[in-house]
């Protein structure tokens, strides 16, 4: 069976050093670092991944690149004239992954749109870069699309952990033994699920 163009693009991203994607990313990231936290793009960087996640080149659908700092939460040291025992310094991590935080920032920048999904496009020593697919919930071309019309019925899905990255942060990508306390929600089991 013959392979499609998307298959070749996918293979190139799976082996970046051999395919030349690594060098291309290294060059592009020098530009990305100088740009803002959320930048609107003309077209997706990874067309194969974008199409897998529901992207279509039509009115009402845009792609933005969101950059977010790497590592744990930046928490300031407790300075109150004494040393507290724990200081609340170590292991202070947010309850969600960086990808879902990047999605939320993109959604805040474009309040008339809903986050459909997102995917990784690169990282360096300080930042991670994700491309977020946003859908205009009032666009006629979106409302006429049988695969995307459901977006018009939802509001703020990214802030409720309904995207793929959000569901992963809630522990819903796992099934079977050991995941009993992830459903119906983490708070219903006193956050013992993760």
From Swiss-Prot:
* InterPro entries the record matches: Rbsml_eL15_core_dom_sf, Ribosomal_eL15, Ribosomal_eL15_arc, Ribosomal_eL15_CS, Ribosomal_uL23/eL15/eS24_sf
Keyword list, A-Z: Ribonucleoprotein, Ribosomal protein
Gene3D superfamilies according to UniProt? Ribosomal protein l15e
Q: Return one GO MF term.
A: RNA binding
A GO BP entry? cytoplasmic translation
Whether Ribonucleoprotein counts among this entry's keywords is yes
Query: What is this protein called in UniProt?
Result: Large ribosomal subunit protein eL15
Instruction: Say which species the protein is native to.
Output: Methanocorpusculum labreanum (strain ATCC 43576 / DSM 4855 / Z)
The root-end lineage is: Archaea, Methanobacteriati, Methanobacteriota, Stenosarchaea group, Methanomicrobia
């Amino acid at each position: 069976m013959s392979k499609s163009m998307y298959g070749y693009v996918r293979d190139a991203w799976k082996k970046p050093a051999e395919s030349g994607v690594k060098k291309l990313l290294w060059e592009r990231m020098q530009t990305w670092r100088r740009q803002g936290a959320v930048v609107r793009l003309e077209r997706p960087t990874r067309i194969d991944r974008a199409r897998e996640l529901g992207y279509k080149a039509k009115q009402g659908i845009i792609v933005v690149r969101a950059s977010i700092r790497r590592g744990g939460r930046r928490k300031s040291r407790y300075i109150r004239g004494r040393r507290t025992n724990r200081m609340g310094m170590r292991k202070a991590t947010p309850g969600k992954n960086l990808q879902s935080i990047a999605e939320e920032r993109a959604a805040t920048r474009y309040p008339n749109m809903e986050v459909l999904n997102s995917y990784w496009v690169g990282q360096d020593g300080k930042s991670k870069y994700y491309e977020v697919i946003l859908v205009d919930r009032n666009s006629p071309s979106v409302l006429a699309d049988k695969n995307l019309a459901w977006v018009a019925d939802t509001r703020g899905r990214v802030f409720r952990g309904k995207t793929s990255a959000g569901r992963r942060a809630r522990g819903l990508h796992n099934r079977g033994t050991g995941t009993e306390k992830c459903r119906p929600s983490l708070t219903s089991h006193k956050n013992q699920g993760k």
